Each structure stands twice: as C-alpha cells, then as structure tokens.
C-alpha cells in the first residue's frame, strides 16, 4: 500500500462492502481502503460466473468459508453446513442468484421498533430501485439504471416451471406477476441477479467495476482483518494479515465492518466489543461490554420435496459429465443455453394459516431433484420444491472460540427450537403435497421421492425434517439494529457506545426478512451510504402494496382436494 491512512476502511468486499466502497468514492475527496480476505473475482472462472454452476463454489474452500455449526440440538445433533462467500463479491459471488427483496410488511414491522421508524417499506423501496437495473424496464417498484443487473424469468424456459406455478394457483393460492412488486404473496416468475448475457451479477461486477479504477479507492485482496484498533471508545483503524505481513491502516473518519452475519460479530468480539463474559474467557481486553454482539442469529431452514418426473423434461441429463462440455461451450461463446440460468425461475410465498399477516412459507421450484450444494442427486428425471419457513422464532449465536483470526467461531443457529417451527414445517409439507397433486402437474408427476408418500403422521414428518432439512444460507441478525438492551447498532449502523465504527450487512437486520437476503443487504448498504455521506434520504415512495388484512390464505377451494391422511 502506498499509504497507511484513509478516510474509511471497509472490512469485507461482499454484498454490502462493495456498495459502500463504490458510493463513498463517488466523492473524489474521500479515500477508501477495501479489505477482502478472499481473492479476486476471476471473470473467466465458470464456477462463479456461470449461473448453472452455482453448486461448485460451495464444494470447495476457494470461494467459501465453509463454516460448520456446532451440533444442532433439535436436528439430531447434526453439524450443519454454513457456507459464506470468500472473495470480491462475498456471498453474492456464490449465492443462488435469487433476487427477492422480502415482504413490504417485513420492513413495516422493523419500523414499529423504537428508533427504526425510517426503515418502513416505502422508505426502503427507493433504495431497492436505486440499486437495480431490471431487464424488462423500470416501474414504481423496479429500477432502470442501477448497478445490479436483474433478469426476470420468461415463459417457455421449461414446462415444469409453468406447471408448478399453475398448480399453486389451482390449489387456491394467488398468482403474482412480480414477487418484488405490488404483491409478494402467491406464485410466479422469479427475478434473478443474472445479466442479460447469462452471467452472474455479483456486487463485484455491478458495483466494483464502476469504482475499481478510481484513484481514491484501494482494494486489497487476501487481507484478513485481525482487529479493529481503538483510542478509548473511538475506532481508529484496522490491523490485518496480508501474506506473511501484519499491516496496520488508520481511519480518519470511520471503520465500516461489512463481513457478514458470521464474521462481523467475530471481528467485533476479537477486537474487544461484545459480551464481556465471552471476551474474558479468551483474555481479550474489553473495549465495550455489548451483550448483543453475536446473539439473535437467525437463518432460513428449508427442505427438498422431490418427485419423479414422468416426462424427460428435467435437467437430469445436464448432470451427466458427457453433456456438460457442450453446455459450457454454448454459455461461454453465446451467453445462452442451460448454463445461462440458475434454474430457480419460478417460486412463491404463501400463508399456511388465515391468521398469518404475511407469507410464512417460501417456495423455490427446480426442474431437477438434487441438493442445493450439488450433492445427493436423484438418478432419474425429477423435480422439487425447496420449501421453508420464513420467520422462525428460534435464534442462535456466534461466539468466538479463539483469538486467532484464521479460526472459525462457534456457530449455533438453534434450529427448530420452538413449537411454531414444527407446526410450520408440517403445514409446509402438507401444503406442498396438495399443490403437487393438482391437475397442472398430472403429466409430469410421478412418485414422491422425498419425504416419501408413506410418511404422513406428525411424528413421521418431524423425523424427516430433523434428519433432512438444511440451511438456505441466509444467516442474519447477529448485530441487530435497534435501541433495546440487545441491539448492537443504531438506525444508521453505528455501533452503540463506540465512535467511528459501523456495521453494515445482513447482521444488522433486527428480524430476518421473508425471502433471500442478497437484495435486502444491498438495499441496507445503499441506504446507510447516504447517511454516511450526509445526503438527504431519497424521497419516500408512494407505491401501493398488498396487505392481507385478514383475507383468507386461499382465494378458493383447490381444483383437486388433498389426499386423505
């Protein structure tokens, strides 16, 4: 590095950090150091650039921190996968590319918390629009000139997508043309962070490509943040490991922690900010006893409901190695074909009970039967629904195990700890079976492969969930925003009790949102970037949005009644 002092130091070049680096350096008089523990975003590496290759980065450690939980007490004491992105782009470099913002009522609910009144949906919507360029053009809900390239599914990609959406409608649930528009609730096409040329649209591509040549931005990869430095109760810089060297950089204005819901609380704790009793166990000098750091950890858990496909229209042949060179060549030369899609092109959100105020279950439809990380592929034509509950009351924690920055922390999500979790997963399995029984899927639907049609009782379904449910890779809320005793940051991401230090990423969500987390994380960073720059907030939207207000979860009876259990 040519200088050791910057206005801002950003720890983590992921979904949020790249937004901040790009927006802050729009001011030519501001200098920014962006630190990333992983490597560059190689634009010719098919593992991260080809949408259909999304499982590959999760199978190694080049782009994946590959965290693992402690034995989960309610999940047969399994140690469960917790993949997080490592490299420029962070988790936007390895995620499933589903662009889902969450439900409007998620943000309206945040705004009911003391001090978070300006996080209501209509306050957030302008920042979602600012970040986005949608291929079908802008409207009241979508942007047309933002850094994130969003494409929406088009008809005719695979007959299974249209059949699964139609089956949801036949089961009595709404149809929606836009899961990010007026009405999230219902079934419809899925927006994706994929470019019109069929490449992954990570924040490294969308944001950093605009900023990396600016003289006031310095990007250092393979730079592992060790500790935040303090003078009293003010953050003054960061010590990081770069190769064999330990480097210290000073921040004239602020240190911005954007390391994600696992690594952000880990870095704070290692630096002496966190629950005092945890820090003293490791002989870490306590800068500030802040009990919420690492607590309130939330995630989405999901399961795969899989069926045999009677017609040869699934992606099963694409899993065979002898077909993959042709798929890869078409993608590389033309940006088209099976390689150009993440194949999550349809999905939906439903309420399983009439008294649920907004959807509590999410669906991703996939025209093949396989685990998200590419494991356990079914050796036949098949299709599946990824199904999971959205706002589990179960919370966990991230706790430092070592002062060594290379050591992974102790992670416990505490999945399925509450009775509501079990009720919602049973409801989800039964609702999914009813959807899959509808006439739209008659020509495709074969045997139920998982859980298996013979599993019907509550105990049998619970046993399946306990053994087979997996993470949806949505950790969040471990440095939550708010003003209660467990809050870590205020409504602008500033760490309570510390000057010159913010956390800006999914960890500051007070409650997890309804859907995938990449889009909300980008929005959070856009909104706080304006606060850091002391810009006037974008004008509040006046767009309309759907509120159930006690309406039935289904608008009518299913075309085909559920099977008798």
Curated annotation (Swiss-Prot):
Amino-acid positions noted as binding FAD in the UniProt annotation, renumbered to this chain: 7-36
PROSITE patterns on file: GMC_OXRED_1, GMC_OXRED_2
Pathway annotation: Amine and polyamine biosynthesis; betaine biosynthesis via choline pathway; betaine aldehyde from choline (cytochrome c reductase route): step 1/1
Signal peptide feature range: none
InterPro entries: BetA, FAD/NAD-bd_sf, GMC_OxRdtase, GMC_OxRdtase_N, GMC_OxRtase_C
Keywords: FAD, Flavoprotein, NAD, Oxidoreductase
GO terms under cellular component: membrane
GO molecular function: betaine-aldehyde dehydrogenase (NAD+) activity; choline dehydrogenase activity; flavin adenine dinucleotide binding
One GO-annotated biological process of the protein: glycine betaine biosynthetic process from choline
Active site annotation, chain numbering: 474 (proton acceptor)
Names of the cofactor(s): FAD
Keyword Flavoprotein set for record: yes
Pfam families linked: GMC_oxred_C, GMC_oxred_N
NCBIfam families: betA, PRK02106.1
Family note: Belongs to the GMC oxidoreductase family.
HAMAP family: Choline_dehydrogen
Job description of the protein: Involved in the biosynthesis of the osmoprotectant glycine betaine. Catalyzes the oxidation of choline to betaine aldehyde and betaine aldehyde to glycine betaine at the same rate.
Protein name: Oxygen-dependent choline dehydrogenase
Species name: Burkholderia mallei (strain ATCC 23344)
Gene encoding the protein: betA
């Amino acid at each position: 590095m040519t200088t050791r002092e910057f206005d801002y130091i950003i720890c983590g070049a992921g979904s949020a950090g790249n937004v901040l680096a790009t927006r802050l350096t729009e001011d030519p008089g501001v200098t920014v150091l962006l630190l990333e523990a992983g490597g560059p975003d190689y634009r010719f590496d098919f593992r991260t650039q080809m949408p259909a290759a999304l499982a590959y980065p999760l199978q190694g450690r080049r782009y994946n921190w590959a965290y693992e939980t402690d034995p989960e007490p309610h999940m047969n004491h399994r140690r469960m996968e917790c993949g997080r992105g490592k490299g420029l782009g962070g988790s936007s470099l390895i995620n499933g590319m589903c662009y889902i913002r969450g439900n409007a009522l998620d943000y309206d609910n945040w705004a009911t918390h003391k001090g978070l009144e300006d996080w209501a949906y209509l306050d957030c919507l302008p920042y979602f629009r600012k970040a986005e360029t949608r291929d079908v053009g802008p409207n009241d809900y979508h942007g047309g000139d933002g850094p994130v390239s969003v494409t929406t599914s088009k008809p005719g990609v695979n007959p299974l997508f249209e059949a699964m959406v139609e089956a949801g409608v036949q089961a009595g649930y709404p149809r929606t043309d836009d899961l990010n528009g007026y009405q999230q609730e219902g079934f419809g096409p899925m927006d994706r962070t994929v470019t019109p040329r069929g490449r992954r649209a990570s924040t490294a591509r969308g944001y950093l490509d605009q900023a990396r040549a600016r003289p006031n931005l310095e990007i250092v990869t393979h730079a592992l943040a060790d500790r935040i430095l303090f003078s009293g109760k003010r953050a003054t810089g960061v010590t990081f490991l770069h190769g064999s060297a330990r480097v210290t950089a000073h921040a004239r204005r602020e240190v911005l922690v954007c390391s994600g819901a696992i690594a952000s609380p880990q870095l704070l704790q290692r630096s002496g900010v966190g629950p005092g009793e945890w820090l003293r166990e490791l002989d870490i000098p306590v800068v500030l006893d802040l009990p919420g750091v690492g607590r309130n950890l939330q995630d989405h858990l999901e399961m795969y409901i899989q069926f045999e496909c009677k017609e040869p229209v699934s992606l099963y042949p694409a899993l065979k190695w002898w077909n993959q060179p042709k798929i890869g060549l078409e993608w590389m030369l033309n940006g088209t074909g099976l390689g150009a899609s993440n194949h999550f092109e349809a999905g939906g959100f439903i309420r399983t009970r009439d008294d649920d105020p907004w959807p509590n279950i999410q669906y991703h439809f996939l025209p093949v039967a396989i685990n998200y990380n590419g494991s356990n592929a079914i050796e036949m034509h098949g299709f599946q629904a990824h199904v999971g509950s959205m706002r589990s009351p179960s919370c966990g924690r991230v706790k430092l195990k070592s002062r060594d920055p290379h050591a992974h922390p102790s992670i416990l999500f505490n999945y399925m700890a509450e009775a509501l979790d079990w009720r919602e997963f049973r409801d989800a399995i039964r609702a999914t079976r009813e959807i899959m029984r509808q006439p739209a899927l008659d020509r495709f639907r074969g045997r139920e492969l998982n859980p298996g049609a013979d599993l019907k009782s509550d105990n049998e379904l619970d046993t399946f969930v306990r053994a087979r449910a997996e993470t949806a890779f949505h950790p969040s809320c471990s440095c939550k925003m708010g003003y209660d005793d467990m809050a870590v940051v205020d409504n602008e991401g500033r760490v309570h009790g510390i000057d010159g230090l913010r956390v800006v990423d999914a960890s500051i969500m007070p409650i997890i949102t309804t859907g995938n987390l990449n889009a909300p994380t980008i929005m959070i960073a856009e909104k706080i970037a304006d606060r850091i720059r002391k810009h006037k907030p974008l004008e509040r939207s006046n767009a309309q949005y759907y509120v159930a207000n006690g309406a039935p979860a289904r608008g009518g009876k299913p075309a085909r009644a559920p099977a008798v259990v």
